[in-house]
A protein has these predicted regions:
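Catalytic, metal-anchored helix/loop core of enzyme active sites in primary metabolism
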Residues: 1-404
Length: 404
């Protein structure tokens, strides 16, 4: 039985992870749940259902949790509850392990606040099932430095899970993320697929008056609001490009993004001999989540497979870089300095929050990110303090640029 700590348990990744765990009794023991605090009743119900001994809440809501627990679980002993800005990182570091045997920390937090828990999990020696792409985008080399053993990170993003699996067709040299990742000399390029979001084929003029409800209507994936907006602007794909470069030690110039509206082929690896290995499955996050929890093993019957005996069509096309400049901004950021990706991410977080609150227009999101990125001078050390300083600068600059 594998010990699991789940961060972001009330979010999209977290709830689906608990679906996987519930569907495979006897294989996992949930040792801790962490959440921001926006859905205390759900968190208490999760803790009661899975007999969780430890709970971490980013907000100061211990009393609210106790009240919810009493209503849901009655006299059942309440788990240990820690609250505050350090609670999630402390929980993330509570498991230990080695390359031969370890528990798993699934980081399903959204945003750069996931960096400290990511570092804590790596330093503890636990396997890190990483859905919090922002950790890699802003943390860069700090992540590699914090790893306790080779292969400690298992990607949970569907694209990076696909790449890790496809890279297994290489020579199985050791790589940063998994026991299978590699064959660097054999790889010509990585191909990240994007659905194209709800605005594929639209012009910039078409996007001028886009509303939040329209942007949240993703054609193929069910995700949280921030990730869904990021997917619509394609900045999510820019962040994933940076993540892939770091995870798999591939030059960003050797990573291509293509639009695949069906969202069945989750990414591909093109080898130097001209062959391409792709990972395909219907769009269902339960699958990469399950693989992250059980890696290198596979769980039985996690999701329905592709219906190979049913007529179907897959299409691939280039994205419109003029309408969707976010991927280009990500390339510029990763080429500029080690701290520019942190600025890119922080500026985007501010802008997406403002858009969802109805305070700015849709096109203002990426336009403002571009202006903030251009104004950053790149000075500062690549350290945790340096990353946090760059993050804070970008947030302040974004608020100023938007007049907020």
């Amino acid at each position: 039985m594998r010990d699991v700590v789940l961060l972001g348990s009330t979010g999209s990744i977290g709830t689906q992870a608990l679906d996987v765990i519930a569907a495979h009794p006897g294989q996992f023991r949930v040792c801790g749940l962490g959440a921001g605090g926006g859905q205390i009743d759900l968190l208490a119900a999760q803790a009661a259902t899975f007999d969780v001994p430890r709970v971490a809440i980013a907000a100061d809501k211990a009393d609210e949790f106790a009240h919810a627990w009493s209503a849901i679980a009655g006299t059942k002993p309440m788990p240990e509850v820690a609250c505050g800005k350090d609670a999630m990182a402390q929980l993330a570091g509570s498991l230990t392990g080695t390359a031969e045997e370890s528990g798993v920390v699934l980081n399903g937090i959204t945003g750069s606040i996931g960096l400290r828990p990511t570092l804590a999990a790596l330093e503890s020696g636990a396997t890190l099932a990483l859905a919090n792409k922002e950790s890699l985008v802003v943390g860069g080399g700090l992540i590699a430095d914090a790893m306790a053993w080779q292969g400690q990170i298992v990607p949970v993003d569907s694209e990076h899970s696909a790449l890790a699996q496809a890279l297994g067709a290489g020579r199985h040299e050791k790589g940063l993320t998994s026991r299978l990742v590699t064959g660097r000399s054999e790889v010509r390029r990585l191909v990240l697929t994007a659905s194209g979001g709800p605005f594929r084929g639209k012009s910039r003029a078409d996007l001028r008056n886009v509303t939040a409800s329209q942007a949240l209507n993703h054609p193929t994936w069910a995700m949280g609001p921030v990730v869904t907006i990021n997917s619509s602007t394609l900045i999510n794909k820019g962040l994933e490009l940076i993540e892939a470069a770091l995870l798999f030690d591939i030059d960003p110039q050797d990573i291509t993004v293509v639009v695949h509206p069906q969202s069945v082929v989750h990414s591909m690896v093109e080898f130097v001999d001209g062959s391409t290995i792709a990972q395909a499955s219907p769009p269902d996050m339960h699958l990469p989540i399950a693989l992250g929890l059980s890696w290198p093993d596979r769980l039985d019957t996690v999701a329905r497979p592709c219906a190979w005996d049913t007529p179907t069509a897959w299409t691939f096309e280039p994205y419109d870089a003029e309408v969707f400049p976010a991927i280009g901004l990500a390339r510029e950021a990763v080429a500029a300095s080690a701290l520019h990706p942190a600025v890119l991410n922080a500026a985007n977080e501010v802008c997406v929050e403002a858009f969802l609150a109805g305070r700015i227009g849709y096109l203002d999101i990426v336009d403002t990110v571009g202006r903030v990125l251009e104004s950053f001078d790149g000075t500062g050390q690549m350290s945790l303090a340096g990353v946090l300083d760059a993050d804070a600068w970008a947030r302040s600059a974004s608020h100023a640029a938007l007049g907020l």
